[in-house]
Amino acid sequence: MEKLTILLLLAAVLVLAQALIKKGGGEKRQKEKINFLSKRKTTAESWWEGECSGWSVYCTSDPECCSGECSSYYCELW
């Protein structure tokens, strides 16, 4: 009977430890996600650094424009 009690306690400790480890990993992933999102630049920053084209500039695809919309080979206003 004592062996069974010890085994049950050991199993409970292992399950608890596993749950704590998984919880810690989840917090790390949340921080990574927040860091990824905070690294994004605003439209104004992208335009200022020349990473996208402003309104009425020649374009061939949507990602080239700060507004994200290339229509009839020119960037839309927004």
From Swiss-Prot:
This is Conotoxin TsMEKL-P012. It comes from the Eukaryota. It is found in: Secreted. InterPro entries: Conotoxin. Keywords: Cleavage on pair of basic residues, Disulfide bond, Knottin, Neurotoxin, Secreted, Signal, Toxin. Disulfide bonds join C52-C66, C59-C70, C65-C75. The keyword Signal applies. GO terms for cellular component: extracellular region. Belongs to the conotoxin O2 superfamily. The presence of a 'disulfide through disulfide knot' structurally defines this protein as a knottin. The cysteine framework is VI/VII (C-C-CC-C-C). Expressed by the venom duct.
